[in-house]
């Protein structure tokens, strides 16, 4: 039931975000959104023109939740090295402690990206690029500040980290086995040590 103080548009976005993140974009229908929000088609179309528009708003909402978790954790870190480890831990936490039901919205939408509406596919790419770019920035900052020296390109290290954790999230959730995720986290942290040697 919609909280009285919550605007209807926000209610639709929040309910749709959970649906898209659990069922997937293609499997989620307007009827599903109507059932979750307890609104009729006209009540939804008062705010959105179509399912694609709802999906875009829902992903933006989900992505902001991801960013909020990163910010709250990263505020506790002082060095780039600490921030890189926090990024790894936050990404891993999305499997069994997601910011929204269904797992990491960035990873989930990326799986569907090749088949998505172009605007939504662009959102998926931008989300993934923003994540990897942030890691690259932390690697560069750490090197400039003399915390460590990277033996590979920032792009390669960041892409490897994200790819490994994305795959581990999927495997761990599919098998409902958190230990497999812990293995991947340890592997990525070891990879970071091997390729970002401290002076």
Residue ranges: model-predicted function:
Residues 2, 86-94, 129-141, 145, ...:
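C-terminal peripheral helix-coil segments that are non-catalytic and often amphipathic
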Residues 20, 29-30, 41, 51, ...:
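Amphipathic alpha-helical segments enriched in hydrophobic/aromatic and basic residues
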Residues 38-48:
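Short hydrophobic/aromatic patch on the recognition helix
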Residues 57, 71-102, 154-161:
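Hydrophobic alpha-helical connector segments
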